[in-house]
Amino acid sequence: MTQAATIEERTMVTEAVDTGFRGIELLEQPLLNKDTAFTEEERDRLELRGLLPARVTTLEEQVALEMEHLRRKDDDLERFIGLAALQDRNETLYYRVLVDHLEELMPIVYTPVVGQACQDFSHILRRPRGLWITPDDEDRIPDLLRNAWLDDVRLIVATDNERILGLGDLGAGGMGIPVGKLALYTAGAGIHPARTLPVSLDVGTDTERLLADPLYLGWPHPRLRGEAYDRFIEAFVEAVNEVFPHAVLQWEDLKQHNAIRILDRYRRRITSFNDDMQGTAAVVMGGILTALRRLDAPLSEQRLVFLGAGAAGIGIARLVRSAMRAEGADELTMRRAIAMLDSHGLVFDDRDPLDDDKREMALGAKELSHHGFDACEPQARYDLETVIRRVRPSILIGTSGTPGAFTEPAIRAMAEAVPTPVVLPLSNPTSKTEALPSDIMAWSGGRALVATGSPFDPVDHEGRPHLIGQANNAFVFPGIGLGTIVSEAREVPDAFFLAAAETLALCTEESRLAQGALYPSQSDLRRVSRAIAIRVVREARDLGIGRHLDDDEIESAVDAEIWEPVYPEMV
């Protein structure tokens, strides 16, 4: 057994463990280091005497001190850097801080602050994390995976860095997303950090600012495309199957065309999913189902308009159709229920241009006629307000990345059509949101139910506070990952995401829904993730693709896999 595997085994338990390290070498192991919390006895046994200040502190005191440090910093990027430094020094303390202050710190370790960190990556990096794979490594990817110091990786988040949040191609800077996402897998679902691996598939960048930067840390070439890109992805998938055959692979921030076809190509060859498509779909579906509790109406009776026909929008629309089908809706009802717009306006069959990726969501002649769009010419363009007035949607979803795209006339048209508009401007970061919640509430006369992709404060409308829930994928992907790991599922089917959405909707308390919130508090993330994981393991069992466990065994198996960041005694 390698020394790395030994570290992993020892950090998975909380009873007394033999570290295998002494002195400075022990303090340099982030998964074992306790800093000033080493006891007097441990300091003597482990040759730490004199290497630490005299006072022995508790984990709780360390958490309080770290929060004091963070709150003293001048801005959120400095807080991000401070948390990253803590993660590099003492992972148990890092995750204890996150778990205890998740609602305050989630915007720092992930959206929106991680976006700024990714943009500045080459100039703020202190210590590299994860694995970096470039086209120069295509013939030796298994060797690179073995260079990772972990022998039992169960969860990989991999990005090619081309569509980082709503910020585009950030090259090597995109690594901040897998690192941040895996931090939330651990903080949110208790997946042990020693079983996770962030991966940057650094295939270059087409962002001139980065290529011209003499301090840029990535592979300094134009982005790999076409057959060469496909060969590289194939080599990576084969290598993961070879080296980490039990790992779940989550694709992250691939551009639309690659995201859809890579998901469809590999989802049954390797246990994998795309969070931007499927995780986003599940968290949005969860918010929709929560809203339907307030509306007291079935999904199959709703009409939805999407502004944005990229991977996220198509993923949401696919899951909406699956949920409608589960309710018993027929094909015609499902096709009429969804209208999608992109940068060229309404998406319909004969439109020119129309990308192949969008054809599955394009309206046909019958659906167009049903909504009053007669004799559409290939060059016809219909904007959002026109589509809203024709379709009369009850739900409006934005994944366009276009700030201000939900205009006042569009929202007012929706409010005229339905008594309680459900408006979801989901684009990240905050600067990309389709509309501000305060504007939506004003334009809808305070009747809208609003959830956003980035965090927003409550909105006061005519003396009544409205909570703005955040449709954060972190409500879904930790539980999906944990459930897939525990179930040992051979694939991650759509049924997992619909199950996660249904579970998430049940986790939003009535008191929050009464104030307009479509999602639970982020401080409830561990409770939500556990519930989703249990449901996913049951779904895997019922579908015959996972372990055969009864319901009590499932709960025990999930609980056994959840790691709590506490210090074990060391001998």
Regions found by a protein language model. Name each.
Residues 7, 32-33, 275-279, 295, ...:
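Adenosine-phosphate binding glycine-rich loop
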